[in-house]
C-alpha cells in the first residue's frame, strides 16, 4: 500500500511538473516584444492582444474608470461626471469613477483586474501597456487637431535662477519616477543638453504630483521644478496660482498627453462600446451649454478626443525611456 501511494505521488509530481512546463511553454509560445509574459502581441502593434480564449474575457456589470492622479481628485470627479453619464448610455453598463492616489497604484490596479477603463499619464503609458495590459486608443486634443503638452522647468521670481545652469547647487523638484515631464524627460534633457546630474549638480526631491511641484515653487518651497505646462495652465485658470508666481526657464518639445484606453481582456464587444463612448462624446450639451468635461479641459485648450496608437504616438516617450535605461518589467 505504501509503495503504491509512493508511486502515485511520484506520478502526480511528474505530471504536475509536466503541466507546469507545458504552461510555461504555452505562455512563451507567442510574440510579445517587451510585454509581460502574460500577454501576446501577434499583430506587432506593441500592445497586448485580447485573449484568444473567450473564457478569459471580462464583462462586469460595472466598469471602473480611473483618471491619472493629477491635482485635486475631487475636481476631476466632477469634471468627468457628464462623460461618465454618456459612457453609461453607450455601453449599457454602470460606470464607477474611482479616485487613485499614485501612478504606481493605478498601474497595479489595472494589472490586478480592479480597473477596466483609464487615462494614464504620458510617462506611465509604456509601463501600463507592458505590465498591465493597457490598450490606449485616444487622446484629448484641441478643436484644430493639435494635442500634447510641453515639459517646463520653472522657478519663482527673484530665485536667482535665470537659466537651467543656475540650478546647480540648488534643489529641483520632480513629481514621480513614472512621470514623463515630471522626471524622465527632464532627467534625459539635463544630462544630454546640460551635463547635469542629480545629487552631483543639484539636490533632487519628489513632490508626488505636478500641482504639488507648481505650488511648491510658487510658495518658494522649491527652487525649481519640472512640470507639465498643461497642468500649470489649468491651475492658473482656476486661480490656484497666478501666472506671475512662476517663471519658465526651459520648454521642451511637445509630448503626447494622457492616453485613454481599456484593459486588454475586456470583452471585445464592450471594448468597442468604450471606444464609441469616447469618439461620440459631444463636448456641449443639446442646449448649447458646456459639459463638465469641457468646462475643465478647455482651460488647457482641449475640446475633442482623437484616435491615436501607442506604437506611433508614444515613440518619443519610449526613446526617452531608453535613454534613461527605464525597464518595463513588472515590479
Q: Whereabouts are the PLM-identified features?
A:
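Bilobed "Venus flytrap"/periplasmic-binding protein-like clamshell domains
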Residues: 65-88, 123, 146-215, 230, ...
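Short, glycine-/small- and polar/acidic-enriched structural segments
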Residues: 29-159
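Short beta-strand->loop
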Residues: 135-146, 203, 236-254
